[in-house]
UniProtKB/Swiss-Prot annotation:
Organism: Shewanella loihica (strain ATCC BAA-1088 / PV-4)
Protein name: Large ribosomal subunit protein bL27
Superkingdom of the source species: Bacteria
PROSITE patterns associated with the record: RIBOSOMAL_L27 (PS00831)
Any single Gene Ontology cellular-component annotation: cytosolic large ribosomal subunit
Amino acid sequence: MAHKKAGGSTRNGRDSESKRLGVKRFGGESVLAGNIIVRQRGTKFHAGVNVGIGRDHTLFALTDGKVKFEVKGPKNRKFISIEA
């Protein structure tokens, strides 16, 4: 009788659920107050004019207007502002 010994079990095969991070509204897009602009870990993007920052570093619009991305300062930081 032909038999094959059972294979061993593995301890791998798990992965965490994706967090859906990233830019949600791009430069020039119109936004309403409260719209999420970026979901991020840490401050990859900094809050500029008319942009608020949540406790998980989410950037959101404080007023209606258009999204503007800019690089400022000696450390070339990326700022996101809303132009009304």
